[in-house]
């Protein structure tokens, strides 16, 4: 199971290659994910890490902790971590290392393929034509008012009802969407930003989860630093302190 990182969608831009071709890319800012809690099989029954990212600050850059409950403050204090913008939990395999204090963007490298999970933009209540791509009814020929109506949904006397799961008008968007196998075009470790080819789900400043795609072979790609080495180095530094 790949280790996920939490980032924020900054927007989209384009890269122009030497031959003049244009590539649309999405910009994801991934600040270091600080580990707040490590769940173990002995205590919790499964292995996982709970991470946070960013800092809660006001417009002046001061820490914004007024509306945070004492329980959450104590949860962060127990891990000696600053209060972040949220908490996310990722399950781990038995052979994955969890003795780190944080995981950063060096997990990814140019040429890697990643999966991005985000929440799609909410479109509100929409009809069947927009939500499910239903065909519209006649614009004329005696049709009045019901141009965009979905039409008949039930049967006659038998069964005389509408089956569950029938596509109808309803809320559109605001659901979890996974975009698979997106190629990492560029990694900027200093700015904590990665560029991936194509679009990703969600609105600007929305949180997304990024992980190496299990459907692609990422083992032979060049990376800035292996995640295992990163974790080991942090553990060694902690012991020296």
Swiss-Prot record:
PTM section of the record: Methylated by PrmB.
Pfam families, per the entry: Ribosomal_L3
GO CC, one annotated term: cytosolic large ribosomal subunit
Example GO BP: translation
Residues modified to N5-methylglutamine: 157
Keywords: Methylation, Ribonucleoprotein, Ribosomal protein, RNA-binding, rRNA-binding
Coiled-coil spans in chain: none
UniProt xrefs under SUPFAM superfamilies: Translation proteins
InterPro entries per UniProt: Ribosomal_uL3, Ribosomal_uL3_bac/org-type, Transl_B-barrel_sf
MF terms (GO), sorted A to Z: rRNA binding; structural constituent of ribosome
Entry superkingdom: Bacteria
NCBIfam families the record matches: L3_bact
Quaternary organization: Part of the 50S ribosomal subunit. Forms a cluster with proteins L14 and L19.
Task of the protein: One of the primary rRNA binding proteins, it binds directly near the 3'-end of the 23S rRNA, where it nucleates assembly of the 50S subunit.
UniProt family annotation: Belongs to the universal ribosomal protein uL3 family.
Name used for this protein in its record: Large ribosomal subunit protein uL3
Organism the protein comes from: Vesicomyosocius okutanii subsp. Calyptogena okutanii (strain HA)
Lineage: Bacteria, Pseudomonadati, Pseudomonadota, Gammaproteobacteria, Candidatus Pseudothioglobaceae
The encoding gene: rplC
């Amino acid at each position: 199971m790949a280790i996920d990182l939490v980032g924020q969608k900054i927007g989209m831009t384009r890269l122009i290659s030497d031959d003049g071709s244009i590539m649309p890319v999405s910009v994801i800012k991934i600040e270091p994910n600080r580990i707040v809690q490590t769940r173990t099989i002995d205590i919790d029954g499964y292995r996982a890490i709970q991470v946070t990212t960013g800092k809660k600050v006001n417009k002046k850059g001061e820490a914004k902790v007024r509306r945070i409950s004492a329980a959450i403050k104590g949860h962060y204090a127990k891990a000696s971590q600053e209060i972040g913008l949220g908490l996310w939990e990722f399950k781990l395999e038995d052979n994955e290392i969890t003795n780190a204090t944080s995981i950063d963007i060096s997990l990814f490298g140019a040429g890697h393929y990643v999966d991005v999970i985000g929440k799609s933009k909410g479109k509100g209540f929409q009809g069947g034509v927009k939500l499910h791509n239903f065909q519209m009814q006649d614009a004329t020929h005696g049709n009045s008012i019901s141009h965009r109506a979905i039409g008949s949904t039930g049967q006659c006397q038998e069964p005389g009802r509408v089956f569950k799961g029938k596509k109808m008008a309803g809320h559109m968007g605001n659901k979890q969407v996974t975009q698979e196998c997106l190629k990492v075009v560029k990694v900027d470790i200093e700015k904590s930003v990665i560029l991936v080819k194509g679009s990703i789900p969600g609105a600007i400043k929305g949180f997304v989860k990024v992980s190496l795609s299990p459907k692609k072979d990422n083992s032979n790609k060049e990376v800035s630093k292996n995640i295992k080495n990163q974790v080991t180095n942090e553990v060694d530094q902690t012991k020296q302190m």
